[in-house]
Amino acid sequence: MAKGQSLQDPFLNALRRERVPVSIYLVNGIKLQGQIESFDQFVILLKNTVSQMVYKHAISTVVPSRPVSHHSNTGTNQAGTNYSGGNATQQDDVAE
């Protein structure tokens, strides 16, 4: 597994498993909302009224609607494993 995915995969998997609503901001400023249905190395399948395949290279930010945590495979809770939406970097004025 690539080092960059050691954080990405557990985060996306927790969002998928817990069916957490997310806002996905694309690099062009578009905001998509829904639940992560599935994902792989290159795409995320986002479900709302329809399913959309979103290429990861087009994604700027994934913002969960509520805090989500994941744990490492070692069973220890390491720093940086909690994620929460509503941080100061969230953009509310993005074109929809």
UniProtKB/Swiss-Prot annotation:
Record field: compositional bias (Polar residues): 70-96
CDD domains in the cross-refs: Hfq (cd01716)
Top-rank taxon, per record: Bacteria
Record InterPro entries: Hfq, LSM_dom_sf, Sm
Keywords, alphabetical: RNA-binding, Stress response
RNA-binding found in the keyword field: yes
Gene3D superfamilies: 2.30.30.100
GO molecular function, one term: RNA binding
GO biological process, one term: regulation of translation, ncRNA-mediated
Region (Disordered) residue spans: 64-96
Any one annotated GO CC term: cytosol
Function comment: RNA chaperone that binds small regulatory RNA (sRNAs) and mRNAs to facilitate mRNA translational regulation in response to envelope stress, environmental stress and changes in metabolite concentrations. Also binds with high specificity to tRNAs.
Subunit relationships: Homohexamer.
NCBIfam families: Hfq, PRK00395.1
Protein name (record): RNA-binding protein Hfq
Organism this protein belongs to: Proteus mirabilis (strain HI4320)
Source species taxonomy: Bacteria, Pseudomonadati, Pseudomonadota, Gammaproteobacteria, Enterobacterales
